[in-house]
Amino acid sequence: MINNQYTQLDHETREHDLYAHGKYRLTLKTLERVNLLNGHESKPVLINVGCGGGLFNKLAIEAGFQVFACEPDPTAFELATRFNHPNLKIFLGDISAIQPPVLADVIVCHDVLEHIDAENIALRQIADSLANSGLFVISVPAIDRLFGYHDEQLGHFRRYNKTTLKRILHFDFDAQSVRYYGFFAIPATLYYSRIKKVAYPELISARSGLITWIMKMLISIEVRIAFPVGTSVIAIARKRRVAK
């Protein structure tokens, strides 16, 4: 059962969530590496599925993308629409709410699939909205044994690992890379969410002081180095070409 108050707080604090910022930096580094912004006469199209409060929308626009975003939660949608930009269109609903439909050069899906029971149907919809060989960047929570209070309050159905994520992507995508993120967050996740079954403390969104400095340093390390396990798993995949 989704806790709407908990979910709203999760969206509202995302702007200052250092963990989320690191994940978004990883995504943008990937998009820079594949050179999506070169060779286009116009801005490449990015669809942000489940955009939440809209933080990544801003970052993607700053990076040079034309962004189409969708968000099914009305509260998060309202937060996202507070940011207006000529290169941004936001729709209330899932990816099918984007009208008229667009074919994207890249689709980003941060922490969305775990909310969806019929995950294969959702992935097929995403594949149908990608251009041939389009890029798909997805992050999901990792490690089954960490499933706890945080997951329950947000209405998660599951957590993943590298193997299970690659398996579900296989039907429509070719995985280019799959890595973990959040190694240093494992102790806090285990203690607060799994053992104590309480909300994470406000430390995760701290904005100053020693704790913030330490967190920024650890996240900076994780952006550069993939550890053998973490609280999230992130995949970069290409849509399989459809024969004409």
Give the ranges of each region predicted by the language model.
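C-terminal helical/coil "lid" or tail adjacent to the Rossmann-like core of SAM-dependent
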Residues: 185-214
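A short His-aromatic
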Residues: 111-115
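Short, glycine-/aromatic-enriched active-site segment of Class I SAM-dependent methyltransferases
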Residues: 136-158, 162-167
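A short glycine-rich, Lys/Arg-flanked "PGG" loop and its adjoining helix->strand segment in the class I
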Residues: 120-135
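Conserved N-terminal segment of class I S-adenosyl-L-methionine
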Residues: 1-102, 106-110, 120-123, 204, ...
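Conserved S-adenosyl-L-methionine
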Residues: 173-183
